[in-house]
């Protein structure tokens, strides 16, 4: 893809479990879905801009895989929602609106932990790994 130099895309399929734990007692599944998001974000950071990288985060969708368990989003409805976002070259592809409740809760918990144990201060970028690596690269000490 890089050698061709033409616009292309990679969309990895994660899950709502990439963002929060929706399915209890599923350690391996949840860990693998978090890894999918990390993979996509790393590729997005490392590859040229003409290669669009995204992650699709489906919630519960009725498919043959779900068998007799009802209550998921209709697969055609899901496809329409996802298709529009891919056409727009979005990198975070979402479908299930209520998941914002879970995301906001998780982000709030993280923000509270930072406020309590690692509050912002003047010059707090001194330990930012991105800034540190950029300086090392500029000083020709580190190459990535």
Name each region found by the language model:
Residues 113-144:
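Non-catalytic terminal and boundary segments that flank Rossmann-like NAD(P)-dependent oxidoreductase
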Residues 37, 47-61:
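Conserved Rossmann-fold SDR core element
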Residues 2, 6, 11-35, 41, ...:
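Catalytic loop of short-chain dehydrogenase/reductase
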């Amino acid at each position: 893809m890089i050698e061709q130099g033409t616009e292309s895309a990679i969309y990895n399929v994660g899950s709502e479990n990439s963002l929060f734990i929706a399915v209890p007692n599923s350690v391996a599944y949840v860990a693998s879905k978090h890894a999918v998001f990390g993979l996509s974000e790393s590729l997005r950071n490392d590859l040229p801009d003409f290669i669009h990288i995204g992650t699709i985060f489906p919630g519960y969708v009725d498919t043959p895989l779900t068998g007799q368990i009802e209550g998921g989003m209709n697969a055609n409805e899901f496809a329409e929602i996802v298709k529009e976002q891919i056409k727009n070259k979005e990198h975070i592809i979402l479908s299930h609106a209520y998941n914002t409740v879970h995301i906001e809760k998780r982000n709030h918990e993280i923000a509270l932990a930072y406020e309590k144990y690692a509050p912002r201060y003047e010059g707090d970028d001194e330990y930012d790994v991105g800034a540190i690596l950029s300086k090392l690269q500029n000083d020709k000490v580190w190459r990535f």
